[in-house]
Amino acid sequence: MRTVILGVIGSDAHVVGITILERAFEAAGFNVVNLGVQSSQSEFIDAADEHDAEAILVSSLYGHAEQDCQGFQQQINEAGLDVTTYIGGNLAVGQDSFEETRETFKALGFDRVFNSETDPEEAIEALKADLGHRSREEASSEKVQLGS
């Protein structure tokens, strides 16, 4: 069973969304480690390392995710983790264009960025595709190493 880390980053205390996501991802066959609300970057990273997670799913609804996520990808890399990272929610105060917001978070290193109206099934299908693609890449990489 694939493990994902889920939580609300920073000072955000919105719990309903991650509860819905936790149940949806579990129903889809994932092992979900739910950090709850007001989680720090290091809590996500430590949990991903401890549970050998394949993905980190970050939620934020209070509009300050950009500040909360500065340096997150760098810390993930420094920890030596190879994880897929998603973020979703109401990520920016007064966001004019979600495309601009998406580009901001892609530049911060997130693999996928979702708005607050995204159906959980969309994120689940995206993660299955991303992890499936990743498994194929790892398998072919291992074959190359074995054949060398």
Curated annotation (Swiss-Prot):
Pathway: Amino-acid degradation; L-glutamate degradation via mesaconate pathway; acetate and pyruvate from L-glutamate: step 1/4. It catalyses: (2S,3S)-3-methyl-L-aspartate = L-glutamate. Signal peptide: none annotated. Residues 1-134 form the B12-binding domain. GO terms for biological process: anaerobic glutamate catabolic process; glutamate catabolic process via L-citramalate. It comes from the Archaea. This is Glutamate mutase sigma subunit 2. The lineage of its organism: Archaea, Methanobacteriati, Methanobacteriota, Stenosarchaea group, Halobacteria.
